[in-house]
Amino acid sequence: MGPSQPASTCVHLAPSLQLDAMSDPRNLQPQNQLQFNRNVPTNPRNLAVRYSCPHGIKIEKLKHSYNELNHGKDLDFKAGNELSSSVSFSVISEERLSYAVHLAKRDVKRRQFEEHVKDHLRSLPHSSHKGMHTKVERKDSKSQDVCHCSHQPSRVSLSSSGAKVYVYTSQPGRSDLTVPNSPPTHDPGLQLQPRIEENKNLWEQKGLLEVQRLQKELSGCIRKIEALTKKDRLEEALDPDEEHRIRVRRQEQAVRCARMLYVLQQQVKEIQEELDKLSPQKIKHTKKSWAVSRLAAAHRAAIRALQVFVTQFTDRGEHPVPARCRELGSLIRQLSLCSAKLDADPSVPDVVIDILQQIEALESLLEKKLSPKKAKKCFTEIRSRFPVGSQKILERWPTVLPKSERRHLVTKETFPQETSRPPVAKRLLAAMCQPDGELQRLESEPDVLDAHLLPEEAPRIEDNGTDFKDGTLTPAKPQAVRRKALTGSMPIRKKDTVESARPQQGLHIAERNRPNQPYSKSRLQQTTVSSRLKMNRQPMKDHRAPWIPPNPTSPPASPKCAAWMKVKYSPRDAAKEQSLQQEDIHKESQLRGDAEQEAARLSWPDAESSKRLKELEELEAKEMERKQKQRLNWLEAETSRRTKELDELKAEEMDRLQKLSVSATQLADKVEEAVLERLKPLLIKAQRVNSSVEANSHLKDRPSRHAAAAAQPAEQASDVPFESRNIPQLRDCLEDTAHELWARTQDKILGSETSARLGDSKDSPDLETMMLRMEEMEKYQETVRQRYNKIVYADPHLWMHEERNDQNTPAVSEGPLASHPIKITKTATQKCPAVNILLERPCNANSLDESVTTEEGSEKREAPLPLSREDLHQRKGQTPLSVPPRMRHSIGAYCSRFEQFLRIIAHEAIGSFNPWLIAESFSDELVDEALGAVAAELQDVCEDYAEAVFTSEFLEAAA
């Protein structure tokens, strides 16, 4: 808490001006002017800073001295246009203010609750006997005293400064708080009994309201289902998205409903366990109130579950959930039996019977919902057999009516249809309609039941756990138990017995006027077995005086006492008592049989539902086993089929590899034969040239200058054709030899590899197939890369033509082909086609020149070779674009700069730039230079050889 800061100056508003001061302009003041009071005394309490805990709300005011107060009064009396002292304000912290608001709200709620209790107690009817009148008057007076004590009008006091202060005075010995639910630690006395009885009545009325709400909800549910069965629902065709949403919503509703049913089942189980622990004779007030509140909460949960079920039923139409409906019906039935067992209110058994009948009607209606033609007929039969709560009963559920009015309503609405009711329902209703006169007769004659009860039933009274559940099936008036307990502890007054005999006489007169119901008349004269078993009675006492041996010194008994004892215990009374006992035994056996029959009838749906659930579980387990077997069989068949397919593929692959190996060896042999055939004439030529060179080498030293000068013109004439004849022959011979040797070595390498693969494939065929597949994948990847690197101008007509060609010629790889986008890029440069040079053996010496000329002519003719089909298709599919020269120049400059940049930094192929291709071109150039050097040397050798041949021939001719 912060420090409380008192105000050092006081402010007030001048609301109006005085009429007499209007003439003086100096005294004129504007309206609503702020005026500051500087005459506040310098009291240390006004200026000190104090710290305090928020124990209570304190209204602190500024204090004035006595003289200043009197002086202010004189000023107020003399001058009316000025205020001598302003209104004093106090400083209150926010925490204190919020706490005060909280307390005020609590007081308002308490006052509203007590007013509601007063109105409820005033609306309750007065009972017929005087005891109830006195009790109600005592309750009203007590409630009025409590309200008067707790809500006295606050006394308003005016301070000297004019501030209004509300002072609340509390009376000692009075408390606004209600009596707690915990048991007292000492004897509270008789003054707290009316408040406890009032709380009991409130809890009982609360439980009755919840039961009646459940009854009303059940009747509404039956009406809605009946309306749905009467009208035909047409299913509309929905979109797939809408159907999916509906399916998801239904799944969520099913999960929510299952969760609610599980929670309700746990609540019912806990309530049943607690009620089994509680003894029917000695139920404490706190435990009973706790049980009533738990029952009310369970009833509210059942109402919510019933509303969810009705919503699902109206949404799904012809697809109800019968298992959940049966489970909910059994839970509501158990709740109703628990409320009847607790005996919270006398009218609870009537409502419980109605709820049980409504549950039976609902279950039978839902069972016959699948056959719409029989539904209407079935529901009319159900309504005739079990009258569901009618409109009058539903209209009166929020208000609590007296027992006499409730009895008249029940007799009006249910007894005309007794002809169609089952006999057990008749007996239960007859037991419910027992009047108060019978209870008063039991009050006035507490020993009648003790006399009617047989000695054999005494051990059953002590062991209540066995017959307590059966007693709930035939509920009786719970006030008989309480009144019996009260009369057993208090002496019976004569006045009360006389007053209780009067309604009993009226009851007998009313029963004489109804001769058509002899069974109910006999039933009304006796109590039920459950009520007698619930009564807390002492063991049977013999009212006769115990036998005392006569004392010779004692005086003899008086004749009056002897005659009284003889008259009281006459044989006629003994016979009458024996006949009454026999009649009680007969009725008890009959009632026990009826109770067992009713218990069997009520437990039949639970047994039937459990039986059906077991059957459903067995069917589900069988279905799961069947599905599992089918799945395993399918898996076995699939695995066997796939293994067969793999074996077939393996065999096919082995056959293909064998064929490939055979074809490879055959191809290698053919290539070797062809190479040998081509090499034989070349070797013969080489040998001839070599022999001629060796034969004419010794003639190089012999030629003379004369011979050389004479032979010079002839040499010039014959040198050119000889040179031109020998050099191309040697060059072609060397090239052919190199190519054939390379092809032969490659074939040998391939043959060795295939043989090694075939040898390995026998051991590991899977590895061989994997390697072949990887090679195919690499080839396909290379084709894809070439396709993407290939830059063409394409159009849809070309695509259609290519698709037709692809359909006509099946591809080797069945992989997916890329799409054909429109590309505007640069085409790759085409290499010049290789020129085939054919060497033929000359027929004579002069034919070499002709062959040379023919070869040159053939080269000229073969230079413009026709393009392939692919090039023709590309040219047909190309689209020419007109590009300005400046733009073309800028594009070329950019490409050159980019290639120069790539030459500096790049080591991989990017676009059209390929460093390895450049390296290969460099290597080709180097090889060409080397070949040129070799050719030059060979040409020199040939020149020397020609010179030697010329000299030899010239010398021979000269000689």
From Swiss-Prot:
Q: Where is the composition biased (Polar residues)?
A: 515-533
Q: Which UniProt keywords apply?
A: Coiled coil, Cytoplasm, Cytoskeleton, Phosphoprotein
Q: Name one GO biological process term.
A: cilium assembly
Q: Phosphoserine: which positions carry it?
A: 279, 691
Compositional bias (Pro residues): 547-558
Q: Which cysteines are joined by disulfide bonds?
A: none
**Region entry Necessary and sufficient for CEP20-binding: which residue ranges?**
877-959
Instruction: Name the domain of life this protein comes from.
Output: Eukaryota
- Quaternary structure note: Interacts with CEP63 and WDR62. Forms a complex with OFD1 and CEP20/FOR20. Interacts with PCM1.
Name the record gives this protein? Protein moonraker
Q: Which organism is it from?
A: Mus musculus
Gene that encodes it? Kiaa0753
